[in-house]
Structures are given as C-alpha cells and as structure tokens.
C-alpha cells in the first residue's frame, strides 16, 4: 500500500481558467492533501475550487480575506499542513506523473534534505509538453554557482546532483523546515521570494539535490495570465 504522506502547497491568484488543467496533476498517489490558498482573487477562483473539490476530496481550500502575496500564502499552508513531507507547487505549472514518487526516492537514495525538481517554460508557439521538453533537451542548462548566486535548472541530467539551491518546486520533510517561514518583509516578486528561504536552509547545513527527472511544465504566457507577478520585482 502506498503511503500518503505529502502535503502540496499552492498559492493561487486570478488563475481560475487554469485550475482544472493544473490541479489534478498534483493529486498523485503519495499526496495526502493539496492545499490551495486563494489570495483574494478577483476572478471566479473560489467557485472553481469548490467544483474541483467535489471530484478531489483531498483538496483543502484556504481563502485570504485580502491579497497577501505568495509569502503569506505559503506560510499559511505550511502552518496547517499535516503531511510528513511538503511539496511546493504553482497554479500555472503542470506536475508530470510520477514526480512526487521520484522525488521521495531521490531523497532516500541521496540522503538529501531538500530535493528540487526541474521546471520548463513553454514558448508561445509550442502546442504540447513534448515540444517544450525536446527544446530543453537541446538548450537546457545546469548552473549552480554559489559565489555568483547564479543558478539554472533546465538541463536533463543522467542522475541527481548536489547543488546549493533549487527551483521553487521542492520536496522536503516538514521537520526540516521546522519554524522557518517565508520572510514577510519581501513585497512584490523579488529576486524570487523563495530565494531567502532556500539559502537559509542551505546555510543551516541542509543538503540540496537537483533531480531533473522530477519535472513540471509551466504553461505559455498567453495562457498563464493572472498570477502573482508584480512590477516591483526588487522591492524589499
């Protein structure tokens, strides 16, 4: 029997038109709950989430009374998560089948504290996921340079590799996170709002591993409208 011990946390803002395409991909066998935090969306996100819950009983819906941004929403999800493991997802990123199982196995095999997945971004002219994957098989890069705070995780590698950072899509034990939370002083879509969170884990001695076979596909920009992006990308 497969143990269901992973809590998925997904903030969402104005992505009602994507939720039926995206959320079902996260209900993988090892997942005990998918926590979606509706960040006071102005579209019909609330109604769509209620419809999805009729089919997927593991969906947990949290509603922010006002728009509080990604950091608050992720922290809110962390505070109620009941799984032994945490996985952070996104409301415009499709989780490939078997990814959660793969990340759990990689964590066990490598002794990693944090396992990061590969995220690929579809171009506007790409019609399906395979086109996106094939392009990155040619053009993908793997960079993990702490001295320059430079990283790229789009290359397909033959095996998991140790690194100092990961994409936002990580799997880790809840006890590894402990009392650490995303810093609420960041406003806007900073040098990625999760960068500080990741580096705090790394500098505390946690081992990061990147597994390119754990894969998410981000929908193209003309479809992935809405979301939490802001103009104040470097505001602190």
Which residues does each PLM region occupy?
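Glycine-rich, basic loop-to-helix element that forms the pyrophosphate-binding segment
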Residues: 64-81
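Short aromatic/hydrophobic "clamp" motif used to bind/position activated sugar donors
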Residues: 86
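Short, well-formed alpha-helical segments that are part of the catalytic scaffolds
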Residues: 15-28
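A short, conserved alpha-helix in the catalytic core of glycosyltransferases
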Residues: 164-170, 175-180, 187-214
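A conserved acidic beta->alpha catalytic loop
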Residues: 25, 38-48, 66, 93
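Active-site-adjacent helix/loop segment of glycosyltransferases
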Residues: 208-236
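Short, flexible, basic/aromatic active-site loop/helix in glycosyltransferases
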Residues: 135-162
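Conserved donor NDP-sugar-binding/catalytic core segment of glycosyltransferases
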Residues: 98-137
